[in-house]
Amino acid sequence: MERRGFSIKTFESKKELTAWIPAIVELYNETFLENWEFNPITEAEGKVIGERLLSIADPKLIKLVMKGDAIAGFLFGFPDISEGIRRANGRIWPFGWFWLLRDMKKTRWINLNGAGILAPYRGLGVNAILYAEMEKTIRSGAFEHADLVQMEEHVLTLEDTKTMGGQIYKRHRIYERHL
């Protein structure tokens, strides 16, 4: 899919995705600079996070929007393994890994937990390109439902969810209390 000079970068293998991790970490840091709760990820942290996420990630659920050779935005999706974690009682050993692997393959839910667009490309429809491409992937695969985790104060993303016909059924808030 290409619109207004933007194209989608998809991944077929974890090896292919691994090569993009440093660029994705850099983009992630640039995208969230304006968020008050954000702490930049170092290169070493990015490598560790990337390795851990690759253990559960399906490369087809990681989407990048490209403007030429530059990354303009991203959307990450992960199979929902929460049922496997419940069945394993939160323990991997001795047999918890079985439930995690089983549910990773059998789940009908996908968690969309990580989306960002660089400031110069916001308001140009990049989010619509990402959502449309992810919807195609979800509908062509074994998934039936998607869960977008978003803070209540991120009004634009919540509006995007409503526009796409999504239903807001959870509120994620941060409370502060001085001790």
Identify the function of each model-found stretch.
Residues 1-12, 173-179:
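Acyl-donor-binding surface of acyltransferase catalytic domains
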Residues 7-117:
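A conserved beta-strand-loop-helix scaffold within acyl/acetyltransferase catalytic domains
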Residues 60-63, 67, 73-100, 113-179:
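Active-site/acyl-donor-binding loops of N-acyltransferases
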